[in-house]
Amino acid sequence: MSRTPSSLDKDKGSSEFVENMNEIEIIEHTRVPSDKPSGFGGHLIDENLVKVEGEDKVTPYLCFLISASAIAGFLFGYDTGVVGVALPLVGTDLGGSVLSSSQQEIITAGTTIGAIFGSAILGGWGDRLGRKVAILIADVFFTVGAVLIAASYSVPQMIVGRIVLGVGVGGAAAIAPLFITETAPTAVRGRCIGVNAFFIPFGQVISEAIGAGVQDMKNGWRLLFALGAVPSLFQLILFHYLPESPRILILRGQTDRARHVFSRIYPNATPEMIDYKFRVAQEYVTATTVLQSGTTYWQRTKTLFTKGSYRRSIVTVSLIQMAGQLSGFNTLLYYAGTLFSLLGLTNPALGGLIPAGTNAFFVLVGMTLVDKVGRRGLLMFGVPIMLAGLVWNIVAFHYLCIPTGGLLDTSYKYDTKLVGIVIGGIVFFTTGFGLTYSHLAWYQSEFLALEVRSVGSGIATTANWVANLVVSVSYLTELETLTPSGTYGLYLGFSVVFFIFAVFCYPETKQLSIDETSLLFEEDWGVKRSREMRRERRETQRRLADSEMTEVATAHVQAQKQKDSAVTRSELDNFMEELKNGAKRFPISR
């Protein structure tokens, strides 16, 4: 579909390069939804048609912005890892008796319960509060919760502290990826979201490492939980120097501040380019405001499940979130100390570093590949590795536990070789998980339309925590009733079902702008539509490049005519061929 020049293109303040682009027939995907007000003319402008020099590079300012935001991911990861190494150290400090399996499960699940509320409330109110304020509120809950846990002298007090902490974990998990998605340039958006995803296993590694070092320290578990308040206080300070999301600033009418944020994100852009980036975002926000006008938060939530395109998008991101949890990976962290004690390791906390470190490394690998290979490409490659790892675990645990009736027994010394095979299966499984769900689950904001992005992100993150709750409160019980092999067989069944769903219903978002990706679900689940949109985008870029070549060739011919009027058509064709052969010298963007 060719794009009709919009009022923005005709604006007197628009630069010459925008006007020139209107002379080219451009395939355009980005349109206001079909139920939009008629005043929008049926289309919106594609931000990617104008690319700034160095846009595919991570600038120092963008690095600061993304890193400060990703502390939320670190806090998420630290809490996930710390409970697994801290609970075995509690001993009789909470009520005078050793924690039972059910008490460990309830304490572990406390954060998950709080996170369900945090992601639903802070995530859902992200538009009204703003991304920045929502993250700051989450930091307050983080800090208060960490203090309550570290000062606990009873199981109920610790559970309350874990719930308070969980509100912060859930809220930050919903908002931080959303904030990053809305501020990062499309060319590096995958890597930027990946930083937040990487900080999750990085936090897990740090908690496991510190836990290994305080095994013999009195009240070491209190220190472990108290240290969780340090990153949240640090983020509170850093966010004082960070801007609000430019789209939220536009929504509030703070246009000068929004332009300033764009100029910081794109330091090499000309004023005209900044104006173009700003006006594109402004059109989307204006369209969204009209779509949201007259509706309440609960009405928009209902719309997510009644309108087909919204429903398909929220189902996709929610199921991908749940897939990561129901694979069982977090049980390796929540109960690392218990599991590796059962396997006979003398320092179980060091054993916890195995899945945490492997996950962190392969999240980093996936983060570097995601903008090249694509989200779907990584999923199709990595999940089969994860499934093979689960099969490995099923078989390995079966043979390991034959002497103890199929169950793990701390009083029995298992064969060292078989323990090594089990750990090898855990590493192989974690490799696939790190490449896929560990970070791809947090790309949820890419799939959601702006008008429901905040509430949708909150719902998807809530789905994550509900699945997390199911796993965390049942793992130790499952080991005792289903046996370790049966437990990982259950996780394998879940993972196979979710992978089949992903094959048919998880579209690629690579190369598409944040405001284009939500259009993938307009007609179906978007897998085929994504391929078509990305192919047409490549053709559009090629035509833009050819147009620049033509302009250069014409200027060359005119210069030659001044010297010699005998320039032939064949000479022009030869010159054009030379340009095409050396097209790298003529960038697509202006």
UniProtKB/Swiss-Prot annotation:
GO annotation (BP), single: symbiont-mediated migration across host transepithelium
GO cellular component: plasma membrane
Segments crossing the lipid bilayer: 64-86, 106-126, 133-153, 163-183, 193-213, 223-243, 326-346, 350-370, 377-397, 418-438, 455-475, 486-506
The keyword Transmembrane is assigned to this record: yes
Stretches of the chain found on the membrane's Cytoplasmic side: 1-63, 127-132, 184-192, 244-325, 371-376, 439-454, 507-590
Keywords annotated in UniProt: Cell membrane, Membrane, Transmembrane, Transmembrane helix, Transport
Subcellular location: Cell membrane
Membrane topology: Multi-pass membrane protein
Sample GO molecular function, one term: myo-inositol:proton symporter activity
Reaction(s) catalysed (UniProt annotation): myo-inositol(out) + H(+)(out) = myo-inositol(in) + H(+)(in)
Disruption phenotype annotation: Simultaneous disruption of ITR1A results in defective mating hyphae, reduces production of phosphatidylinositol and glucuronoxylomannan, reduces laccase activity, and increases expression of ITR1, ITR2, ITR3, ITR3A, ITR3B, ITR5 and ITR6. Simultaneous disruption of ITR1A impairs the ability of the fungi to traverse the blood-brain barrier and leads to attenuated virulence in a murine inhalation model of systemic infection, and the brain infection models by tail vein or intracerebral injection.
Ranges per topology, Extracellular: 87-105, 154-162, 214-222, 347-349, 398-417, 476-485
Disulphide bond pairs: none
Protein induction: Induced during sexual reproduction. Expressed during infection.
SUPFAM superfamilies according to UniProt: MFS general substrate transporter
NCBIfam families: SP
Family listed: Belongs to the major facilitator superfamily. Sugar transporter (TC 2.A.1.1) family.
Function as written in the Swiss-Prot or TrEMBL entry: Major transporter for myo-inositol. Plays a role in the traversal of the host blood-brain barrier.
Name of this chain's protein: Myo-inositol transporter 3C
Organism annotation: Cryptococcus neoformans var. grubii serotype A (strain H99 / ATCC 208821 / CBS 10515 / FGSC 9487)
